[in-house]
Amino acid sequence: MSVLVAFSVTPLGVGEGVGEIVTEAIRVVRDSGLPNQTDAMFTVIEGDTWAEVMAVVQRAVEAVAARAPRVSAVIKVDWRPGVTDAMTQKVATVERYLLRPE
């Protein structure tokens, strides 16, 4: 099974410069050992089970909460039994379609 989660965590009440605090969440994700990617808006993480992935998301939110009085989180889940490597396969599929002549 593949559980693919895109999430963002935003510390509130700490001023405009939040990059250093958000880095704590990214560190938790990277230290988890699960496949992940971070872009300007979200971090995507993939695991075999809901519990495995959501435990990492929870630790990431807690890492931000340790440094901010309030935290906002946006979470999107793609739960797809029978699929592996969804994070790269979904992008690869779109890239293949882009190579087709119109």
Swiss-Prot record:
One of the record's GO cellular component terms: cytosol
Family, similarity comment: Belongs to the UPF0045 family.
NCBIfam families (UniProt xref): MTH1187 family thiamine-binding protein
Protein name: UPF0045 protein Mb1933
Species: Mycobacterium bovis (strain ATCC BAA-935 / AF2122/97)
